[in-house]
Design a protein with these regions (language model features):
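Histidine-centered active-site/metal-ligand motif
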Residues: 27-28, 96, 110, 236, ...
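Post-kinase regulatory C-tail/linker adjacent to protein kinase catalytic domains
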Residues: 52-61
Length: 250
């Protein structure tokens, strides 16, 4: 059919991103809301995933090596040696590629107080077994990504992205453009270059298959412009998307 060929696709289903020199961020939304807004409107066939079991397995894996967590947390102490929770959660998000929700759970184990973590890991692994068992009782298996499978096929369902998936995507694109620390700020509180980086992150978040860019790096300083150009080239190769890039640089 024409729509399978990519012709006649309704506007809200087109995976197209636009990035201009004048990026229009929503002034009444935080950086986080600006990036996540488009993601919360996506509704399409996706794999059905058992996130609770997946996150329990991930946390169990991390808790088995508590020293790594403690060394990340130790970097987040103020001059009086007190742990700064907000900074610690941001660090855990990036160090272990977690969502803010899972990072908060990890933080709440308070491994910095010398706890071993192995008992908690065992409890989480029991939870993983329960998750696999209840999937089996319902006639499914869980694959290594914790997707529900039946007869070896991944089960698809038309659904919206979960809070967890949205958060992981926001964190992933904010790592690319280095804006993780600005999540709670409003556009007016950012410099032109920072706003430009938010606009880039917002455009990349839904993983467009075609990306139109007109001077997207013009407001960045020379070092960041080079980094972002390299990053866009890498994304181009990694995602296999089509990039149309307009520049007036000689």
């Amino acid at each position: 059919s024409l729509s399978e060929l990519g012709i006649n696709i309704p506007a809200n289903k087109r995976k197209v991103g636009f990035l201009f020199q004048n990026y229009a961020l929503w002034p009444n939304m935080t950086v986080y809301q600006n990036i996540s807004f488009g993601l919360s409107n996506i509704k399409e066939p996706m794999a059905k995933i058992d996130f609770e079991t997946k996150n329990a397995a991930r946390l169990a894996e991390i808790l088995k090596a508590p020293a790594e967590v403690v060394s990340v947390l130790d970097e987040c102490r103020d001059k009086d040696g007190k742990l700064e929770e907000k900074k610690a959660i941001l660090k855990l998000i990036d160090a272990f590629t977690l969502s803010q929700y899972t990072a908060k759970k990890l933080y709440d184990y308070h491994l910095e107080s010398g706890k071993d973590g192995r008992n908690e890991a065992a409890a989480l692994l029991a939870k993983v077994d329960t998750g696999r068992k209840s999937a089996a009782d319902a006639g499914y298996t869980l694959d290594e990504e914790y997707r529900f499978c039946r007869d070896g096929e991944v089960v698809m369902q038309t659904r919206k992205l979960t809070k967890e998936e949205i958060d992981l995507t926001v964190r992933r694109v904010s790592r690319i453009v280095k804006i993780g620390m600005f999540m709670d700020r409003y556009p007016a509180e950012l410099s032109g270059g920072q706003q430009q980086r938010v606009a880039i992150a917002r455009t990349l978040a839904p993983e467009p298959t075609v990306l139109f860019m007109d001077e997207p790096l013009s407001n960045l300083d020379a070092k960041l412009r080079l980094e972002m150009r390299y990053e866009l080239q890498r994304l181009h190769v990694e995602t296999g998307s089509t990039f149309v890039y307009v520049t007036h640089d000689q």
